[in-house]
Amino acid sequence: MAVASRVDAALTAVPRERFLPPGQRRHRRRDAPLPIGHGQTNSQPTTVRQMLELLDVQPGDRVLDVGSGSGWTTVLLAWLTGAQGSVVGVERVPDLVAFGSANVRAAGMPWAHVREALPGRFGAPSQAPFERILVSAQAPELPLDLVSQLAPGGVLVVPVAGRMLRVTASTDDTGGPAVEEHGWYRFVPLVADPPDEPQVD
C-alpha cells in the first residue's frame, strides 16, 4: 500500500474526536489545531497527514513521538507500526501525560505508551535508537539530541523555525544527516523543563 493510502487508512481507523476534551469534540471535523489545555493543541489534521507521510513509518518500526499531547499521533503511529513495532510518546505536562496515557490505553494498542519527559532532555535516550521520530512542536534549531536517537538510516520529522524538516540519519559513521525542507508550518514551541536541581544537605 502506498504511503498516503496507509496514512489515510490510519486517520480513518483512529478518529480524532476520541482524543479531544469533551468541549472540543463538536469541532472534530475542523481542519485546525484544537486546544487540549495547558497551552497545547491537538494538531491540524492536514498537517498530521503531511507529517506522517514524510515520516513513512513501516510495520515493525520503533517510533518516538515527541510532544504526544492527547495521544492521537501516538495511536496513529501505533496503527502504522502494527503490533510488531513499538511507540513511545513523550509529554512534559503531567496532566497531558495522564490524558494521553488514558487515550492510548483506550485504543487497545499495548505496544504504544506515553511517559513523562525527562527534565532537561528531549526524547527518550534510554530507549533509543528509533527508526522514526515525530516531533509535534517547533524547535528554534535542529535538535541534535533527537538526531542522535535515530537508528542508522532513521528518519526524524520536525518543524524548525517555521520550516518542516525531514532528517535522515546516515547509514554509517562517515557522514552527517541529510536534511530536506518541506514547507512552512506553525506549532507550539518545543520545550524541555530545566534539569532537576541537585539536592544539598
Short names for language-model regions:
Residues H38-Q40, A83, D196-Q199:
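Short, charged/polar low-complexity linear motifs in solvent-exposed/disordered segments
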